[in-house]
Design a protein with these regions (language model features):
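Short, glycine-/small- and polar/acidic-enriched structural segments
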Residues: 28-174, 182-185, 189-195, 211-212, ...
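Bacterial N-terminal signal peptides that target proteins for export
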Residues: 1-10
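Pocket-lining segment of extracytoplasmic ligand-binding domains
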Residues: 178-277
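C-terminal motif of bacterial Sec signal peptides marking the signal peptidase cleavage site
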Residues: 17-21
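Secondary-structure end/capping motifs
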Residues: 234-328
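Bacterial signal peptide processing site
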Residues: 23-25
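Conserved C-terminal helix/tail region of periplasmic/extracytoplasmic solute-binding proteins
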Residues: 311-364
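Soluble non-cytosolic domains of exported or imported proteins
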Residues: 45, 72-76, 91, 147-151, ...
Length: 364
């Protein structure tokens, strides 16, 4: 497989030393290949299946790109990797990006990937927690203590006047079966994860109840970002990457089962030991179909807005982050997302991609 995955549960300093010199400096010349070091905070799974599609269907290759996925395990390391130059493009919700901007990082949001919010707090259906006020004294399970979802949960609970480490605490529990067991076993009172994780838990027979605020529910989620310097020097590379991901997302939305089967082939370790492919598919389809609703909100194919940010949504994020105490000073999120590459992202034959998805078979 051409996507080379590196698991890096290290800080950006370690990333810089291990990957220094790998980052591309300019678009690939005719007939050559540009390598992108791409930071991903979570392991490959249904939520990231469009990445596998972009590789397997040749969408990256068509753009002269090879993508190295660097799995960091948290969002903070990705921001630090972009700052250090050890990563070219990163994937994370906006919270840690906005935090870094207040500390002087010159970052640019380049592709609005998940167009609606994925994160919320979740409890078991029979939990005594009935409102945000009831989280006083709670232990909240996080994928890690460097995840953007921890910041989001703190923002949600701030609306009820609750303060972390005073009124409630966090505990790293991972994701998947480990997180679910921590919740069911009483190690934590709630989880702060995301849509596909929750959908998989419910598909396996664990009903949940969710807590958020109207303000948070209206925000977009995962975004692709880079340094302002990389964006200025590598426009063609960013355009190609975004166009490939737009195609892959459209393919996935058209035929989610094909996207998952492609992912299983490209990443065999996404199959849970003891599960048949059909059993795994039944769980992952529920999760992916929930994610597709967020990936395609506003019908970006019809509107030609793959990767685009709405100015009001950017302002809403900056306001929420400041009001919730995620950042301690105002940032200009609109200026950080100039939309320079959106026209190029949408410059492809959508009908051809849809046909390709509908016609896909496992024999390909």
């Amino acid at each position: 497989m051409n996507i080379r995955r590196t698991t890096a549960l290290l800080a950006a300093v370690a990333l810089a030393s291990s990957l220094a010199g790998c980052a591309s400096e300019s678009p690939a010349a005719e007939g050559s290949t540009t390598t992108i070091e791409f930071g991903l905070p979570t392991n490959m799974g249904a939520n990231n299946s469009p990445m596998a599609v972009a590789e397997a269907m040749g969408y990256f290759a068509e753009e002269g790109l090879e993508v190295d996925i660097v799995v960091t395990g948290d969002s903070t390391s990705i921001v630090q990797g972009i700052d250090s130059g050890s990563l070219d493009i990163g994937s994370t919700p906006p919270e840690p990006i906005l935090q870094a901007m207040t500390k002087g990082s010159d970052l640019q949001l380049v592709y609005n990937y998940i167009r609606k919010q994925t994160g919320s707090l979740a409890v078991l259906a029979d939990s005594p927690i009935q409102s945000l006020d009831d989280f006083r004294g709670a232990v909240i399970g996080q994928a890690s203590l460097g995840t953007s979802n921890m910041l989001l949960s703190e923002g949600i609970l701030a609306s009820a006047g609750l303060t972390p480490d005073v009124d409630y605490s966090h505990l790293a529990v991972g994701t998947g079966a480990a997180a679910l067991q921590a919740l069911k076993g009483g190690q934590v009172d709630a989880l702060s994860l995301w849509d596909t994780e929750y959908a998989a838990f419910e598909a396996q027979g664990t009903p949940l109840r969710y807590f958020t605020t109207d303000e948070v529910a209206s925000l977009f989620s995962t975004t692709y970002f880079t340094s302002a310097e990389y964006a200025a020097d590598n426009a063609a590379t960013i355009e190609g990457f975004g166009r490939a991901m737009a195609k892959a997302t459209l393919f996935t939305a058209t035929n989610p089962e094909a996207a998952l089967r492609i992912m299983y082939d490209e990443y065999p370790d996404t199959l849970v030991a003891g599960n048949s492919i059909d059993d795994q598919l039944a769980i992952d389809l529920v999760a992916l179909e929930r994610r597709i609703e967020l990936l395609t909100a506003g019908d970006p194919q019809a509107s030609g807005t793959w990767g685009a940010y709405d100015e009001s949504a950017l302002k809403a994020w900056a306001t929420f982050a400041l009001d919730a105490g995620i950042i301690d000073s105002a940032v200009d999120a609109v200026a950080a997302a100039p939309g320079t590459f959106v026209e190029a992202y949408n410059d492809f034959d959508g009908d051809a991609v849809i046909s390709e998805a509908k016609d896909w078979s496992a024999a390909e």
